[in-house]
Every structure is written in structure tokens, then in C-alpha cells.
């Protein structure tokens, strides 16, 4: 007869033993993910004791965005600081930002990013040629989708904000 805690010879867990997965404690990260875990987690056969405490909404109705949700004439904290883009900006509207008119550049060198295509997107090139194509100097010009100049004119310390 096999000893308790050992799997029988033909494989599978021994009868009457728990798998080691059930015995392992939950990692510490679990507690960080669930803030007041012990208070409201459902236990077997017991009703929930308490609910997680949600912070009450400070301003605006339910479901309404709180940041940058004012009408275009009003100044709110996020909009007034100039650091954030307005959420209420319509599709045709051009924002004035650090680079001039238009949005901040997505690819600073001004070319279409070839890296963004997954390998199956270019089946016609073998991998070696693909890398050679990426190594060619990309044409310089205005940033993608923007009317601003690249590199930006003015203070060279523009990166430090």
C-alpha cells in the first residue's frame, strides 16, 4: 500500500491528499490588487460581510468625465495648465501645442514607422532584407500628421520640462 502523500505507482494523486497547488499560499501581490480583501471576499456558503468602499464622486454626474469636460469657453485645471490635451477636442479641430499646430509627433524622424508592421505584413522580403530596409536613413521632414517643423526650432533644452 502506498504511503500517504506519495502518488501511487500508476500515476495520479494519492487518494485522500490535496494537490500541492491548493496548499500554496496566495502571493503578496494578490493582497495589493484587492485592497480590503479579507473584509469582503466571499467565503464558502457565507454571505458577503461588507462591500469594498468606493470613493464618492467629487464633481459631475455619474458617467461624466471629470477631466477636461467643460465647454470650450471655460477653463478647467487640466486645460488651463496647458499640459494635457483637451478631451472635448473635436475631430476637425487643430490643437495648439508645443510643436505648433497639430498633435505631438508620434514618430520623431518623420517617416512611417516600418517597425510597427508585424513580420507577416511583408511576406515578399526575406528577414535579412527587412533589416536592411530598416537601416536606411529615414527621410527627415515634418512629424507624422503634424504641421510643425522637426526638429523643433528654439531652445535645445525642450526635452526638459
UniProtKB/Swiss-Prot annotation:
Comp. bias regions, Low complexity: 1-16
Annotated segments matching region Disordered: 1-23, 50-91, 140-161
Protein name: Putative uncharacterized protein PAK6-AS1
Upper taxonomic lineage: Eukaryota, Metazoa, Chordata, Craniata, Vertebrata
Gene name for this UniProt entry: PAK6-AS1
Amino acid at each position: 500500500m502506498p504511503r500517504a502523500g506519495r502518488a501511487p505507482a500508476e500515476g495520479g494523486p494519492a487518494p485522500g491528499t490535496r494537490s500541492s497547488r491548493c496548499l500554496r499560499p496566495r502571493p503578496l501581490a494578490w493582497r495589493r490588487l484587492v485592497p480590503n480583501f479579507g473584509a469582503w471576499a466571499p467565503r464558502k456558503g457565507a454571505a458577503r460581510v461588507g462591500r469594498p468602499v468606493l470613493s464618492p464622486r467629487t464633481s459631475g454626474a455619474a458617467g461624466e468625465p471629470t477631466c477636461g469636460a467643460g465647454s470650450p469657453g471655460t477653463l478647467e485645471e487640466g486645460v488651463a495648465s496647458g499640459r494635457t490635451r483637451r478631451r472635448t477636442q473635436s475631430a476637425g479641430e487643430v490643437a495648439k501645442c508645443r510643436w505648433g499646430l497639430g498633435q505631438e509627433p508620434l514618430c520623431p524622424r518623420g517617416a512611417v514607422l516600418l517597425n510597427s508592421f508585424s513580420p507577416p505584413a511583408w511576406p515578399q522580403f526575406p528577414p535579412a532584407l527587412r533589416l536592411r530596409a530598416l537601416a536606411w536613413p529615414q527621410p527627415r521632414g515634418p512629424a507624422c500628421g503634424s504641421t510643425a517643423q522637426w526638429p523643433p526650432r528654439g531652445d535645445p533644452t525642450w526635452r526638459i520640462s
